[in-house]
Amino acid sequence: MCLSLLLTVVSSRAGAADDPLARARLLYNQRQFQAAVTAAEEARSTPARADAADLVAARAYLERFRESAATDDLTNARERLRRLDPQRLAPRERVEYIVGLGETLYFDQSFGAAAAVFESVLQSGELLAVVARDRVLDWWADAVERDVRPRPEMDRRGVYSHIRERMEDELALHPSSSTAAYWLAAAARGQGDLQAAWDAAQAAWVRSPLAADQGATLRADVDRLVQRAIIPDRAKSSAQSPQALQQEWERFKDRWKR
């Protein structure tokens, strides 16, 4: 996920041509990750900018790893995060650094540790644009869920309850949060509260136009959740057939078709 390096781009495109660090940031935001790494390595030759350059390179390597799953990319990201001095970063860059640590832990499958790192970013409440915060929130919820999967059912339900509470709070503060709308339904389902999951899925569907992309991504995600998880679970626990629940869901979507 490209999170919030856009916050740190202050140079124009023309200026980026003469400034390798600005060029690296611009290329990162354009998803040209190898070119961003190359520009960051050039910027690193200036000692005062080496740490910021390593941060851009680390984030670019993390994005490459998400696309390729090549272990070298994850190793390179970890190496750059390990060697940079966060005290030399600007405040917004330090937030990016912490998010990068969380992503690296997540990709290392240290999900509990990753969740703790993402939690610290969310709790700070500072220096994150709304869209970037939404993505960190998604990283957090996914890391928490993956961490709890092997645990006993009683433990899982308690964790899903925590996710629900967090998402309710997020929606109260940020009504356009697609992540909170989705995870409110997903966590209710994980907790075994299937009626609440169904209700939250419908609520997410109708509020989806608040999202930056007019709700296209949220609706697709909610539709998968309902059809692959909530409907089968409700059918098992009620007298309704999967076909009847599917028809009910389709009628609901038709009423709110855009």
Positions of predicted regions on the chain:
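N-terminal leader/linker segments that initiate helical-solenoid repeat arrays
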Residues: 7, 12-76, 250-258
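Helix-turn-helix repeat elements of alpha-solenoid scaffolds
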Residues: 25-41, 68-82, 108-120, 152-165
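Alpha-helical junction/boundary sensor with strong preference for TPR arrays
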Residues: 40, 47, 81-88, 124-126, ...
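Boundary/linker segments of alpha-helical solenoid repeat arrays
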Residues: 48-53, 89-93, 126-134, 178-179, ...
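TPR/TPR-like (Sel1-like) alpha-helical repeat modules
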Residues: 79, 119-123, 155-159, 194-213, ...
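Terminal, low-structured helical/coil segments at or just beyond the last alpha-helical repeat
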Residues: 157-161, 165, 170, 212-258
